[in-house]
Amino acid sequence: MPVFRAVLFDFFGTLTCSVQRGTAHRSTAELLGCPVDALVDVLDRSYYQRASGRFGDAVATLRWVCAQAGVHPPESALRAAVASRRRAVHADTRLRDDAVPVLTALRAAGVRTGLVSDCTHELPEFLPQLAVAPLLDVRVFSVQLGRCKPDPALYLSACGPLGLAPRDCLYVGDGGSQELTGARRAGMTAVRLAAPDLAGHMVFNAEPAWDGPELGSLSDVLDLVGPVALPACRPDATVGPVALPA
């Protein structure tokens, strides 16, 4: 019998490798007639406002960003830039090699899976194209809920559709947005993914003082749920439950 009945994952830096803005974002800036540095500055300082959907849909949000950067592109350019930005964020997204095997193993063991992500409009648009999409029983996006981590509403919004109490859920994240403290306060057990590639990860509002358990790889999640076997890459590995500190 699994120790936890569900595992909820952060997305960027957890199910994905470390994220940095790639060169594709330059195309978005060019479409808007905006210097790249000015665009990035507004994007960075407005992240939580945008991730909570404060400015409306993707076009309205980018229009607000442009105004803050001092440019006022026509509607056609805004719409083209929204599509360009979606492609750029998608291009920045590389799933971890063990993301699909881990989710597959959890579901095969009867453990529910979910996504709880602080994100802007792009992720809900392209997530259905990713291999992890059919392996997630519930998806909670801050931009749709109107709240960001560490607000307990995000975590509890995942519990409801699963029909589970927070204590039945394990939360896994890299620690951005104070998400681990938020999950713990919501009544979940939280663990930090401390994979080596995250040293250069683009993160907002990290929690370096996290004193809870950490994992070196996403596959280590299975050691906390057990007994679960990871398919293909670890065919003989069946692990038992591991006790976590309260």
Regions found by a protein language model. Give the residues of each.
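Asp-based, Mg2+/Mn2+-dependent phosphohydrolase catalytic module
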Residues: M1-F9, L31-C34, S76, V100, ...
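N-terminal helical cap/lid subdomain that shapes the substrate entry/recognition surface
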Residues: M1-P101, A109, H121, E125
